[in-house]
């Protein structure tokens, strides 16, 4: 029985040895790399970076975050096609170190946090891991691109949109009515201003105005029409107004309309009328 237990215990040794051998032989590598990100101005972002050293022995590991600004133009296409963790060709003399973390072990990780990003924060960010497991220090790099979009559109674009909105909504909705009102106002102003033109006499010394051929004909027709109108008005007045004697009788009978009315004897009225005619005859001789 004990012999079987020993053989069973020995049966677990090969897998354990194989696992330890794999840990020892496995190469160091990133377990988490930063990725390209596009954000708007004022947003907060995080870029992860994690690294595992080779073997199970505790080593000294150091991780650094660097800001490389904008990469060279000839590398932009290569950056778009390459894997984020394998970008080790982007170098910049103006690189700026952001942070440094150092641990004793075989795993290390550090997240880069940027709050309220600005347009000038756009560029390449690099995670550098220094592995001191061997006599020669090994350095591993992983890069990611940060793109920052403006939160607001340029002022000229806003002005263009406002003008476009006014042009598209204003005239279509109120254009015909405004045009009709403008035409009516223009016609009214012409109607009121035309009578005044004939009243104004030209200043002295100015050349005589051109006479329209139709004006004399209109004047002649007006002159011919004026006597006819005068005669008709006179006839109407004569037919409408009674003789003087009858007017006296009417005034005596009906009164002037403002004072008191008195009842008069018809005989007295005839006598007064005869007296009036007699006086006219005397005055005539």
UniProtKB/Swiss-Prot annotation:
It is a single-pass type I membrane protein. Residues 161-226 are annotated as: Disordered. Disulfide bonds join 49-127. Residues 1-28 form the signal peptide. Residues 177-189, 208-226 have a biased composition (Low complexity). Residues 285 are cytoplasmic. This is V-set and transmembrane domain-containing protein 2B. Residues 29-143 form the Ig-like V-type domain. It is found in: Membrane. GO terms for cellular component: membrane. Keywords: Disulfide bond, Immunoglobulin domain, Membrane, Signal, Transmembrane, Transmembrane helix. It comes from Homo sapiens. It holds the Pfam family V-set. Residues 29-263 are extracellular. The chain crosses the membrane at residues 264-284. PANTHER family: V-SET AND TRANSMEMBRANE DOMAIN-CONTAINING PROTEIN (PTHR12207), V-SET AND TRANSMEMBRANE DOMAIN-CONTAINING PROTEIN 2B (PTHR12207:SF27).
């Amino acid at each position: 029985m004990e012999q079987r237990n020993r053989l069973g215990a020995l049966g677990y040794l090969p897998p354990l040895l194989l696992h330890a051998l794999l840990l020892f032989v496995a190469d160091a590598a990133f377990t988490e790399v930063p990725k390209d990100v596009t954000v708007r101005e004022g947003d907060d972002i995080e870029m992860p970076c994690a690294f595992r050293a080779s073997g199970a022995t505790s080593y000294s590991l150091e991780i650094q975050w660097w800001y490389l600004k904008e990469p060279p133009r000839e590398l932009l296409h290569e950056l778009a096609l390459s894997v984020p963790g394998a970008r080790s060709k982007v170098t910049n003399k103006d690189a700026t170190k952001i942070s440094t973390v150092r641990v004793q072990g075989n795993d290390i990780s550090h997240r880069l946090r940027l709050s309220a990003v600005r347009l000038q924060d756009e560029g390449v960010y690099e995670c550098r891991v220094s592995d001191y497991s061997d006599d020669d220090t090994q350095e591993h790099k992983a890069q990611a691109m940060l793109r920052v979009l403006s939160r607001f559109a340029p002022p000229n674009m806003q002005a263009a949109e406002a003008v476009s909105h006014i042009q598209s909504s204003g005239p279509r909705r109120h254009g015909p009515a405004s045009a009709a009102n403008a035409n009516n106002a223009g016609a009214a102003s012409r109607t009121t201003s035309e009578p005044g033109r004939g009243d104004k006499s030209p200043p002295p010394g100015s050349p005589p105005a051109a006479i329209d051929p139709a004006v004399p004909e209109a004047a002649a027709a007006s002159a011919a029409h004026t006597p006819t109108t005068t005669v008709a008005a006179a006839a109407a007045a004569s037919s409408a107004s009674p003789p003087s004697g009858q007017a006296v009788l009417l005034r005596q009978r009906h009164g002037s309309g403002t004072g008191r009315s008195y009842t008069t004897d018809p005989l007295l009225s005839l006598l007064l009328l005869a007296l009036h005619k007699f006086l006219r005859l005397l005055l005539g001789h």
